[in-house]
């Protein structure tokens, strides 16, 4: 029987009142623990207060500043329990972008309530605008998407949310070493899709959830050891930083049943490093999108047999189409379209153009890739990321991976830099290890031993950090096309 979130949380609290539901950390990093009884009571109180603050005759949504804190976790759960659409907001969102998001939400729902640190809902004063859209299907939650290319869109997930033992978590997550009641660590921010949905799945499946308020690689390793974490979701950026730790001991990960990585393309060195650390049977990769058009899954042993793949469709059909909308043969790159039965898990944008869809129900978020003869998907860079050097196409990921292989380099981003003759050349923003020093000519020579000549960066800029989203996705749009600081390589 499908249960409401409120009923499910209450049932767990009745059955296991003293078991730990959540572990968080205060601003002083002191441990904060809530039992299931304490968590259920606080969720019920906050849900009641939220519903009391709303005009139930009007459509409304709740916005929760979603740092990885106990109040944020309670606020999200309370909105779901109250069956009020909830939007987890990055607390560091600039005011102009935040106001734009509020206007989008107001356009869909009419009223927006922001929950403060005490979980008190405050109505957002929206400037006069168009009347709210006509009533639509019920919404469980809303998530920001597309931040790697500018101001995010908002994707709405149909609701209300229900707990169904057969469908919680989803079938694909159940294939990744997941067990009900396990100990789970949330590393990524709750306002991002993968950590948010992992939190909801863990909540409904009675897990003990540890919330890491910010990523620090040594701390992540310590939390895994201290709490005997069994299931962990990471991004490739997290994985690279952890692998760089000195004296990394595989014994510290003995409790882990599985690591699932998502959110961005993972370079081969990082993937092999984690397979070496845990063994191939404990490393999983999931490719999907906030919009829920479909997913692929690959385990480490499959990846070793087909390096670079993100797996085969899981309850998902995949079709690769060219620019004219025609299917292409295996091995040929094109736009990735996916289809799931009855639009399972599909979300749609709030006040945005609908997701691009074919007449027979295949949908795309614009990613590019190719299929091999076995149906395994390999992602390619999107057209706007590819660097065109005199007609030769350069995959920025390949350049970045070559630079990260240098012992002085922590991170790098490759971008197109205008060139009078070639149209563009490769430029890079490079982050060095603390205390490291390296000449641009040395980095260029290092790349020259790994890359074709036209792929070698011609301009270098040394920076303290490169712009990434909370999920670790590179935000190339934040990088200026022209490099400064005398950054041209000799």
Each language-model region and where it sits:
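Conserved ATP/PPi-binding loop(s) of AMP-dependent carboxylate-activating enzymes
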Residues: 312-313, 326-357, 392-394
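AMP-binding/adenylate-forming catalytic core of the ANL superfamily
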Residues: 72, 232, 340, 360-361, ...
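Gly/Ser/Thr-rich phosphate-binding loop
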Residues: 147, 204, 231, 247-306, ...
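Conserved AMP-binding/adenylate-forming
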Residues: 32, 48-93, 393
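Conserved AMP-binding/adenylation subdomain of ANL enzymes
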Residues: 166-183, 191-230, 245
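Conserved AMP-binding A3 loop
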Residues: 35-37, 140-166
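Flexible, low-complexity linker/hinge segments
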Residues: 1-4, 116-139, 164-166
């Amino acid at each position: 029987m499908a249960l409401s979130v409120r009923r499910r949380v209450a049932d767990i609290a009745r059955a296991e009142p003293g078991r730990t539901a959540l572990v968080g950390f205060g601003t002083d990093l002191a441990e904060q623990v809530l039992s299931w009884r304490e968590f259920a009571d606080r969720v019920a109180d906050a849900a009641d207060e939220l519903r009391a603050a709303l005009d139930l005759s009007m459509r409304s949504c709740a916005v929760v500043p979603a740092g990885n804190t106990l109040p944020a976790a309670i606020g999200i759960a309370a909105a779901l329990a109250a069956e009020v659409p909830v939007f987890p907001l990055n607390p560091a969102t600039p005011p102009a972008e935040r106001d734009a998001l509020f206007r989008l939400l107001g356009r869909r729902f009419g009223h927006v309530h922001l929950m403060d640190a005490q979980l008190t809902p405050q109505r957002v004063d929206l400037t006069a605008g168009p009347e709210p859209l006509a009533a639509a299907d019920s919404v469980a939650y809303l998530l920001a998407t597309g931040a790697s290319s500018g101001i995010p869109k908002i994707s709405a997930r149909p609701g209300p949310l229900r707990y169904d033992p057969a469908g919680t978590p989803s079938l694909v997550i159940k294939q990744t070493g997941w067990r009900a009641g396990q100990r789970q660590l949330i590393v990524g921010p709750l306002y991002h899709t993968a950590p948010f949905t992992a939190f909801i799945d863990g909540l409904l499946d009675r897990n003990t959830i540890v919330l890491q308020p910010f990523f620090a690689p040594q701390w992540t390793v310590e939390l895994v050891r201290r709490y005997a974490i069994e299931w962990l979701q990471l991004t490739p950026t997290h994985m690279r930083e952890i692998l760089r730790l000195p004296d990394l001991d595989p014994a510290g990960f003995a409790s882990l049943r599985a690591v699932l990585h998502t959110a961005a393309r993972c370079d081969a060195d990082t993937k092999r490093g984690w397979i070496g650390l845990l063994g191939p049977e404990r490393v999983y990769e999931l490719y999907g999108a906030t919009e829920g058009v479909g997913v692929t899954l690959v385990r480490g042993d499959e990846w070793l047999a087909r390096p670079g793949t993100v797996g085969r469709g899981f309850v998902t059909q995949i079709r690769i189409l060219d620019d004219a909308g025609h299917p292409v043969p295996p091995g040929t790159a094109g736009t990735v379209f996916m289809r799931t039965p009855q639009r399972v898990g599909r979300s749609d944008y709030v006040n945005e153009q609908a997701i691009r869809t074919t007449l027979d129900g295949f949908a795309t978020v614009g990613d590019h890739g190719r299929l091999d003869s076995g149906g395994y998907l390999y992602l390619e860079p999107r057209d706007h990321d590819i660097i065109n050097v005199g007609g030769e196409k350069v995959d920025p990921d390949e350049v970045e991976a070559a630079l990260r292989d240098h012992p002085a380099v922590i991170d790098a981003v490759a971008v197109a830099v205008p060139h009078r003759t070639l149209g563009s050349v490769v430029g890079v923003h490079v982050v060095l290890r603390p205390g490291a020093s390296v000449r641009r000519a040395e980095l260029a020579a290092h790349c020259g031993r790994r890359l074709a000549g036209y792929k070698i960066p011609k301009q270098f800029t040394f920076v303290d950090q490169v712009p990434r989203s909370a999920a670790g996705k590179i935000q190339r749009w934040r990088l200026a096309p022209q490099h400064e600081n005398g950054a041209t390589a000799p």
